[in-house]
Amino acid sequence: MRCIIKRLFQNILTRSKRGSADGGSAEALPPKSLRQFVGGAYKEVGAEFVGYLVDLCGLQPDEAVLDVGCGSGRMALPLTGYLNSEGRYAGFDISQKAIAWCQEHITSAHPNFQFEVSDIYNSLYNPKGKYQSLDFRFPYPDASFDVVFLTSVFTHMFPPDVEHYLDEISRVLKPGGRCLSTYFLLNDESLAHIAEGKSAHNFQHEGPGYRTIHKKRPEEAIGLPETFVRDVYGKFGLAVHEPLHYGSWSGREPHLSFQDIVIATKTAS
């Protein structure tokens, strides 16, 4: 499945570059500064996670998708080749520059792909943000999406903020809708690997209900107890799919991706 999605993504890039040569879209990819904002391996990670959305969440071409923390379109670009004209994509992010690029280069060619700036405070990424995460209401109606996904978002958020976002995710999901999100989950195995020095992150500093790699900049990377995450999903009617898809960050084998992936379905209300 992932190989199919990667080939599809490469075809999209080829068409974009051809359009640029013909006087169409000026860029196939965001500038390097915007790609680095969302992390490395821009194309590869985008293709990887669209594969997970299709394979693990059962995303259909005619469904409505919400990308929380969409950045500069790393997932949106490959999704333009998967969602059809009946499908719909919405994404929001704290980066005005990233959203402006997406609106100019993606929405202009795909009107069913919409992007919004969310001026949410983050001590690292948006220190002048207007809203606190706990006060932010997703700008979408109840039960308006089939799939909601977040990649490398909850890995930078404190437990109360994660809980609020999961409440909002449950609100905007249709009954039977699915959610994919990534974490650094702290459980017996990952904590043992951390203690043995096998983990990519040591999470040596403890905060209220979380661990972090940096005492002064805790949002740089946050690990959450798996028990907490499971409890919050249950609180908001999100049934977790078993087994969880643990990542390689802790030194665990086997693994699926780098971060831990949790898939859940909203139960009928």
From Swiss-Prot:
Keywords: Methyltransferase, Transferase
A GO biological process held by the record: methylation
Entry superkingdom: Bacteria
EC number per UniProt: 2.1.1.-
GO molecular function: methyltransferase activity
Keyword Methyltransferase: yes
Broad enzyme group: transferase
Record family assignment: Belongs to the methyltransferase superfamily.
Protein name per its UniProtKB record: Uncharacterised methyltransferase MT1546
Organism, scientific name: Mycobacterium tuberculosis (strain CDC 1551 / Oshkosh)
